Curated annotation (Swiss-Prot):
The active site is at 112, 248, 278. Residues 249-253 are annotated as: ACP-binding. It comes from Streptococcus agalactiae serotype V (strain ATCC BAA-611 / 2603 V/R). The keyword Transferase applies. The gene is fabH. It is an enzyme of class 2 (transferase). Homodimer. Belongs to the thiolase-like superfamily. FabH family. GO terms for biological process: fatty acid biosynthetic process. This is Beta-ketoacyl-[acyl-carrier-protein] synthase III. The keyword RNA-binding does not apply.
Length: 323
């Protein structure tokens, strides 16, 4: 049998940093108000870089670290809810940029769960035996869909990208998964961007992301924690077997409550939302890459981690992976 493993990690963020104090100059907020409620202290915001630009930086790093040529990559999946255009896809732009002439490429949109959904999809492609190597990247420029006068959303999000190289392995690394969607609750978080039909009188001009923060918070604590507990139980692992839980970096309070609901020590939940804010589909791979850089992750195949994303759709999904 053929299995899949994560062999490389990388991340990139725009150089421009907007601190909470900077936001207090343009809206009714303060560093204390933001940090006490979210844990966020700053975020990276793109000036001129596109979502594809951020993803390109990650892809370049992954290729360089691996020692492979871009022509050896079989596929590229980019998880994003902020693509630069309807077509070509962000992934196609990355494919062209790095010269991955033999790779097929496509985007996947599942909001803040996007990277988990994309990684699960990529694992199936490699496990089929048809493909050997693939790039899975989460990339977002959420700043371009924010209403910068709305402190309910503007203070939360940031731009960035992270990703992994996934390749074939003789050993099993992906141990369990759970992917979920509840489209009946899509109104909790949405960006009502649309195209105006010339045959309709309806005008779609609401271009900003909207979010019911309390509803998302309650959903994450109740549904996502339940899903994670169930996944661990059905994986035949004990909670003590999980070395770290890499959750979507939306809010420090969510991680605090998740730790209690799942009954796993808080220090097993790495975090970096204080430096990046909520980067949607990019948050988990950025955190993974930083955790490897600081020595928390070894990439030796001996650590067991749980990845969990949750957000608009509603979508939520978790993977248990040997890394």
């Amino acid at each position: 049998m053929v299995f899949a493993k994560i062999s490389q990690l990388a991340h990139y963020a725009p150089s421009q940093i907007i601190k909470n104090e900077d936001l207090s100059l343009i809206m009714d907020t303060s560093d204390d108000w933001i940090s006490s409620r979210t844990g966020i202290k700053q975020r990276h915001i793109s000036k001129n870089e596109t979502t594809a630009d951020l993803a390109n930086k990650v892809a370049e790093q992954l290729i360089e670290k691996s020692g492979y040529s871009a022509s050896q990559i079989d596929f590229i999946i980019v998880a994003t809810m902020t693509p630069d255009s309807m077509m070509p896809s962000t992934a196609a732009r990355v494919q062209a940029h790095i010269g991955a002439s033999n790779a097929f490429a496509f985007d996947l949109s599942a909001a803040c769960s996007g990277f988990v959904f994309a990684l699960s999809t990529a694992e199936k492609l490699i496990s089929s035996g048809s493909y050997q190597k693939g790039l899975v990247i989460g990339a977002e420029t959420v700043s371009k869909v924010l209403d910068w006068t709305d402190r309910g959303t503007a203070v939360l999000f940031g731009d960035g990208a992270g990703g992994v190289l996934l390749e074939a392995s003789k050993e099993k690394h992906f141990l369990a998964e759970s992917l979920n969607t509840d489209g009946s609750r899509q109104g909790l978080q949405s960006s009502q961007v649309g195209l105006n039909s010339p045959f309709s009188d309806e005008v779609l001009d609401d271009k900003f992301l909207k979010m019911d923060g309390r509803a998302i918070f309650d959903f994450a604590i109740k549904e996502v924690s339940k899903s994670i507990n169930h996944l661990i139980e059905t994986s035949y692992l004990e909670k003590e077997d999980i070395d770290y839980l890499f959750l979507h970096q939306a809010n420090r309070r969510i991680l605090d409550k998740m730790s209690r609901k799942i009954d796993i020590a808080r220090d097993k939940f790495p975090e970096n939302m204080m430096d990046y804010g909520n980067t949607s589909a990019a948050s988990i791979p950025i955190l993974l890459s930083e955790s490897y850089e600081n020595g928390l992750l070894k990439l030796d195949g001996n650590q067991t981690i749980l990845l969990s994303g949750f957000g608009g759709g509603l979508t939520w999904g978790s993977l248990i992976v040997k890394i």
